[in-house]
Amino acid sequence: MFNIKLETLNIFEVHSNKIMGLIKDIYSVTFYEKFGQAVAEVHPTFDKQKFIDAIYKGDFAQKEWKDRMKHTTVVLHQFMPQNFPEAVALIDKIIENLKKNNYTDSNLAFIFFADYIEMYGLDDFKTSAKAFVSITQFISCEFAVRPFVLKYKQEMINEMIKWSLHENHHVRRLSSEGSRPRLPWAMAIPFLKKDPTSILPILENLKNDPSEYVRRSVANNLNDIAKDNPQIVLEIAKKWRGKSPETDGIIKHGARTLLKQGHPEILSHYGLESTNIELSNFEIKTPVVKIGDYLQFQFDLNNKNNEAKTVRLEYAVHYKKAKGHLAKKVFKISEKTYQPNQLIKVDRNQSFKIITTRVFHTGIHQLSIIINGTESEVLEFELIS
């Protein structure tokens, strides 16, 4: 059986069709045989063979990963107690039995447990909130919890504030990850995009969390907030600055969108200014690029100050879109300290290989270098088929 973990492979950020094909195969005959046996050991009336037959009835082979997961939830429900609290109690027993059989936490295959709560527990707040605490210690509930935030709003957020103080790091992470206004590949939470102040106590409680796994979630939550409410993140950056190396790390990662945007206040916060940082010999070596090949460019950078300077170095590709306009995408090169009068030469390649997450359009594109948030002259290149 595949043992793919959410902590090392976030399925919702994977774009390769080859990898997605592999992931859907975690739902195999072997998996359902072993899972069915684990259920039967704690649920005497469970008919393992009927369960497996129901799983494979119809077009299972044609289903992709998410559809297989959802299908598993629906079929499992047919074999569970129809009383929701009783079903949740049974899920807890199944999970404990899986742990005894050496299934460790964050095994992606079992995400249907979280999905079960989302699908069948939305009208039972108390039971579901308790279920999330137990299930997320085995498999993340960050996606399943979001409909509850939308429906119950502050009541759910109050629960999540409690979770942020929980002894288990998976539960603490759920309080942050589940309340992100813009969690990728999940439904957005409009009222938190508009005003995220209700979730700030969660982030405050977690800013010094001993788990990097949790702190990374706090940073991602802040980055979500920054996209709609930059001033809130700027104020938090000032408030948390220098509290600890970990907190400084959270702020730096949480402000990454603001840094890419060249937001003046966050650049000032980090002492990033471009005076006397000279760009020269900026050249596109491949002015005509074929889709599938690389754009190649080079430039020199010289710190002409009499003191060392931190330089955040980026470049922007202005992609031509379907309607003819250009859309800017910023890529980070480095952020490091340059000594007085230090000169460096930079050579870079930018891929135009076909990927599932970007559609390329032939025609004139643009390229620029960004030094501490300040964009340089813009050069053009042509993309051809």
What do these predicted ranges mean?
Residues F2-I266, K290, E307:
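Surface-facing alpha-helical segments and adjacent helix-coil boundary elements at the starts of domains
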Residues E265-L279:
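Proline/serine/threonine-rich low-complexity linkers at boundaries of modular beta-sandwich domains
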Residues I277-S280, K321-E335:
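Short beta-strand and strand-turn-strand segments in soluble, beta-rich domains
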Residues E283-K290:
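Short beta-strand segments of immunoglobulin-like
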Residues D293-N302, N306-K321:
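Beta-strand-rich binding/interaction modules
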Residues F297, K328-I355, L383:
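A beta-strand/beta-hairpin structural motif
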Residues I354-I364:
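Short glycine/proline/serine/threonine-rich loop/turn segments at secondary-structure transition edges
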Residues T374-S385:
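Short beta-strand elements
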